[in-house]
Amino acid sequence: MLDIQFIREHTDIVKESQRKRGESVELVDEVLSSDTARREALKAFEEARAQQKEIGKKVASVPADEKAKLIAETKELSQTVAEYKAKADSAAEEYTTAMWRLSNIVEPEAPEGGEDDYVVVKKVGQIRDFAAEGFEPKDHLTLGAGVAGIDMRRGVKVGGSRFYFLRGQVARMQIAMLTMAVDQAEEHGFTLAITPTLVRPEVMRGTGFLNSHADEIYRLREPDDQYLVGTSEVALAGMHENEILDLGNGPLRYCGWSSCYRREAGAAGKDTSGIIRVHQFDKVEMFVYAKQEDSYKEHEHLLAMEQEMLAKVEVPYRIIDTAAGDLGSSAARKFDCEAWVPTQGRYRELTSTSNCTEYQARRLNIRERMEDGGTRPVSTLNGTLATTRWLVAIMENHQQKDGSIEIPKAMRAYMGGKEVIEPTKWEA
């Protein structure tokens, strides 16, 4: 949610942000109109109530012959007050509804355009020349089957499309990767949290995911009115809902480990095989509560953390600055790290890090205590540190001619010193 005072004073900036996102510019006028109606209705209600109280005070002190008249006026005014109260409540509801539909203000540096209008910030690593090595690279699904590590057939049998089993050494590789991510996060001062994967509607709405991504989210049927999270960002944001934080010693940094669930409603025909786009996966997510003036520095820090992790798994990648029209409603700016996938001949997203400024904090009422005793909303930021999809890039970029998979050096200590995952037959 945005600051209404900012919207009043900088209407053009908010409208320009909506335009860059490809969202309704007229919504800004709707917010301002409902704001005016809300304030006018509230003023009328408060004036009528004050008048009612004033007359009520006089009843006890006036002569008996005047009391009947004042009592009649009080009753009549009570009806007026009730009507004004109803109008004020209705106006407040319309205002809140409009405000919650507004997306965060895009940072001026974010590129304009849609999904394909990102800007490549830099490329890191050397893309392998498999032709020079004398063999055609296998895709991750073929490699996974060859080492008895990815079972899509039985995953579909159990859960339906886009489900899978990770088994054996590939399952161990995921655990190793996620554990390595947690260790790195803790080394940088993040606190590990195993988070809930079911959240209340108020928390999901507060993070902004019900604005533009509602169709991607699983929701439990009544009477259990809860949502399955697509990232631990949701739970970590809700953890300090309605709290006042002490950021005097620096940002609060969390590292969330959770299973994640996504409907992939808009993904018909995309990545229908393999584990790139699935309904359930595991992820380690960074989440930060920071002072408003520190959010940009923290955003750079999260991006550096992602790059450090990518260096450990030794895959070529690039960083892109996401265009305004491809930002989620909460993000003011977002950077993605995309790894090279040899068999697809293109880069695929592995991480994203977003600066949500005060947008989520205002919606969830999360503030910090200031030195003067006052409070103000904090900034929230998030970033991926490792997720199931990383296995695709690791397996394909580290494959050998015989179908084996070389384990990245940094991960070997997490796999008992093992250096290579050898081809093996299914036991069952």
UniProtKB/Swiss-Prot annotation:
Keyword annotations of the record: Aminoacyl-tRNA synthetase, ATP-binding, Cytoplasm, Ligase, Nucleotide-binding, Protein biosynthesis
Source taxon at top rank: Bacteria
GO MF annotation terms: ATP binding; serine-tRNA ligase activity
UniProt keyword RNA-binding present: no
GO biological process: selenocysteine biosynthetic process; seryl-tRNA aminoacylation
Signal peptide: none
Xref: Pfam families: Seryl_tRNA_N, tRNA-synt_2b
InterPro entries: aa-tRNA-synt_IIb, aa-tRNA-synth_II, aa-tRNA-synth_II/BPL/LPL, Ser-tRNA-ligase_type_1, Ser-tRNA-synth_1_N, SerRS_1_N_sf, tRNA-bd_arm
Subcellular location: Cytoplasm
Binding positions (ATP): R262, R263, E264, V278, E349, L350, T351, S352
Keyword Ligase applies: yes
CC terms in the record's Gene Ontology section: cytoplasm
EC class: ligase
EC number, UniProt record: 6.1.1.11
Catalyzed reactions per annotation: tRNA(Ser) + L-serine + ATP = L-seryl-tRNA(Ser) + AMP + diphosphate + H(+); tRNA(Sec) + L-serine + ATP = L-seryl-tRNA(Sec) + AMP + diphosphate + H(+)
SUPFAM superfamilies associated with the record: Class II aaRS and biotin synthetases, tRNA-binding arm
Pathway stated in the Swiss-Prot or TrEMBL entry: Aminoacyl-tRNA biosynthesis; selenocysteinyl-tRNA(Sec) biosynthesis; L-seryl-tRNA(Sec) from L-serine and tRNA(Sec): step 1/1
Binding site for L-serine: T231, S232, E233, E285, T384
Domain remarks in the Swiss-Prot or TrEMBL record: Consists of two distinct domains, a catalytic core and a N-terminal extension that is involved in tRNA binding.
Its biological purpose: Catalyzes the attachment of serine to tRNA(Ser). Is also able to aminoacylate tRNA(Sec) with serine, to form the misacylated tRNA L-seryl-tRNA(Sec), which will be further converted into selenocysteinyl-tRNA(Sec).
Family: Belongs to the class-II aminoacyl-tRNA synthetase family. Type-1 seryl-tRNA synthetase subfamily.
Binding partners and assembly: Homodimer. The tRNA molecule binds across the dimer.
Name under which the protein is recorded: Serine--tRNA ligase
Provenance organism: Bifidobacterium longum subsp. infantis (strain ATCC 15697 / DSM 20088 / JCM 1222 / NCTC 11817 / S12)
Source lineage: Bacteria, Bacillati, Actinomycetota, Actinomycetes, Bifidobacteriales
Gene giving rise to this polypeptide: serS
